[in-house]
């Protein structure tokens, strides 16, 4: 299984291409991130890769997130240990098209929801 490291500076299109290639070849890829910005880039990369795979291979993806400890051997005195996130991305059979899952069909306003609940 290929292991990819993602930072806040990772280019989404390149990450998506790498994810798609690894899924086509091996059916699985591991993505490691530290920090919210890096996680954001990783999720965007998975979304774009999912489109690539749906368009040319009729494949979908599943994601299994887990917390992982990051090596603390380089921490200076007083620094806290860091926890990262590992995303295991696997090939999955397509059940819904990405448009059905991710597109917003109508705008929902908070006031409309609250009005419905109060009736």
Regions found by a protein language model. Name each.
Residues 36-64:
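Short, hydrophobic/π-rich interface segment
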Residues 22-40:
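Short glycine-rich, basic-tinged beta-strand/loop micro-motifs
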Residues 56-118:
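C-terminal edge-of-domain segments
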Residues 7-8, 18, 30, 37, ...:
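Generic serine detector
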Residues 2-28, 46, 50, 83-85:
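Conserved mixed alpha/beta catalytic, RNA-binding, or beta-rich assembly cores of soluble enzyme
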């Amino acid at each position: 299984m290929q292991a990819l490291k993602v930072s806040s500076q990772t280019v989404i299109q390149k990450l998506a291409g790498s994810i798609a290639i690894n899924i086509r070849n091996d059916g699985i890829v591991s993505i490691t991130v530290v920090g919210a910005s890096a996680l954001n880039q990783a999720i965007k990369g998975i979304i774009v890769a999912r489109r690539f795979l749906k368009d040319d291979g009729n494949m979908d993806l599943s994601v299994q997130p887990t917390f992982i400890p990051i090596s603390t051997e380089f921490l200076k005195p007083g620094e806290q240990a860091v926890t990262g996130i590992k995303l295991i991305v696997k090939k999955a059979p397509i059940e819904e098209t990405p448009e059905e899952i991710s597109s917003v069909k109508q705008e929902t306003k908070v006031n409309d929801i609250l009005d419905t609940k109060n009736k």
